[in-house]
């Protein structure tokens, strides 16, 4: 293994070796964080409390993860089920905000990181730890999201980011694991880096890194490939109240269960695969493959319902608010006052986002085919092309003359000046 880089001093919250006695490590049970657990003990001579947080990511056995950390020397190992908090305080607001970074990415990782950091802070205080450690790289967004949250909520705590300190590639990590008796799962040998929770899944690295490459089929493990999806379409009715989904096909359920059910429906129909290039906070342009079946289904339905119940001005303003909300979330600024201000507006606007939306799923497509709401502003008697429409068409010419006044004047005056 290469020597550890000298501890950086670019920020006051970064831990120096003499300051570290007990560390809360955000632990997944995978190769990276298992190596970190041993590495922190060796390099910092510190105790480690392993914290594994369930945000709905698929896993074989959380108890096995808890025990693995203890076997590797953790003084305590905690598994916390945070799915309800995740959907209530993070995913729910994201649904109301139609949250998609740069118009595409539904922000599932970005939504989870502030919660992980918040719970790590709580665990550090409960276990008398002085430092929090995470497995994020120095090239990614997650280091920003986690560390910004930690220093905001707990300025007394220090942070360790082992991946920024050590000089190990994947092969060196595997060698370190073998040398230190760390069990290696078969998934650790896969060429892709994975991250997932209840709201979505990402794959990056390997052949994915080059945007000129066509990604092989084996990357997608959550969503059925569209070509292999059923040959018949499937309709699902999503009921919203106060801007949040509350029922599928008339069956009411809590948001965790609803997201899980929506994911099943969308995934089996090939809905929710995204091949995405985006701009990271740190300045890099990167490519990821996202599998977001529930998010694609729910966000598409929610946006269409808003279009039905909002005025034109509300729709324009909401689009701007949503884009700013997504940007702040992506950047990890969960405690930025502006986000609270945006949430207040969104909550007020969402009071009328109520009704049913029917989405038709077919071989990768999710199309809204019907929508209804007691607050809908669509009036068939006005909009119809039939002769008995109640819309006062004869009033239109006067409106057009006034509506176009300044545009007409500007064009005509400027044309006259140019013609002189």
Predicted segments, located by residue:
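Nucleotide-activated chemistry modules centered on ATP-dependent adenylation/adenylyltransferase
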Residues: 2-26, 31-420
């Amino acid at each position: 293994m290469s020597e550890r880089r000298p501890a950086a001093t670019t920020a006051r919250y970064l831990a120096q070796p003499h300051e570290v006695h007990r560390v809360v490590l955000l632990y997944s049970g995978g190769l990276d964080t298992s190596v970190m657990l041993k590495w922190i003990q060796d390099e910092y001579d510190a105790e480690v409390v392993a914290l594994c947080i369930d945000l709905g990511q698929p896993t074989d056995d959380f108890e096995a993860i808890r025990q693995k950390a203890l076997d590797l020397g953790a003084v305590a190992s905690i598994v916390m089920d945070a799915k309800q908090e995740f959907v209530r305080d993070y995913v729910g607001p994201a649904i109301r905000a139609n949250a998609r970074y740069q118009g595409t990415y539904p922000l599932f990782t970005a939504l989870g990181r502030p919660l992980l950091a918040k719970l790590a802070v709580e665990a550090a205080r409960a276990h008398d730890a002085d430092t929090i450690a995470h497995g994020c790289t120095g090239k990614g967004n997650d280091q920003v999201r986690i560390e910004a949250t930690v220093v905001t909520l707990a300025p007394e705590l220090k942070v360790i980011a082992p991946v920024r300190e050590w000089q190990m590639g994947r092969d060196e990590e595997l060698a370190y694991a073998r040398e230190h008796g760390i069990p290696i799962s078969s998934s650790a040998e896969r060429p892709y880096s994975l991250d997932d929770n209840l709201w979505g899944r990402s794959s990056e690295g390997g052949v994915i890194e080059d945007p000129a490459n066509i990604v092989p089929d084996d990357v997608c493990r959550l969503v059925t490939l569209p070509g292999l999806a059923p040959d018949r379409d499937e309709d699902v009715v999503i009921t919203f109240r106060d801007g949040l989904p509350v029922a599928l096909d008339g069956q009411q359920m809590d948001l965790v269960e609803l997201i899980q059910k929506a994911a099943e429906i969308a995934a089996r129909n090939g809905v929710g695969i995204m091949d995405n290039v985006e701009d990271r906070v740190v300045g890099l342009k990167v490519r990821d493959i996202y599998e977001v079946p529930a998010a694609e289904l729910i966000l598409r339905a929610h946006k269409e319902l808003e279009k039905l119940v909002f005025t034109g001005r509300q729709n324009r303003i909401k689009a701007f608010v949503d884009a700013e909300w997504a940007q702040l979330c992506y950047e990890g600024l969960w405690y930025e006052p502006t986000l609270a201000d945006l949430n207040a507006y969104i909550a007020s606007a969402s009071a009328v986002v109520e009704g049913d939306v029917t989405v038709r799923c077919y071989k990768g497509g999710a199309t809204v085919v019907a929508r209804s709401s007691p607050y809908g502003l669509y009036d068939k008697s006005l909009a119809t092309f039939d002769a008995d429409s109640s819309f006062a068409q004869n009033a239109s010419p006067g409106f057009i003359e006034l509506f176009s006044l300044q545009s007409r004047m500007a064009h005509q005056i400027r044309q006259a000046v140019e013609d002189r």
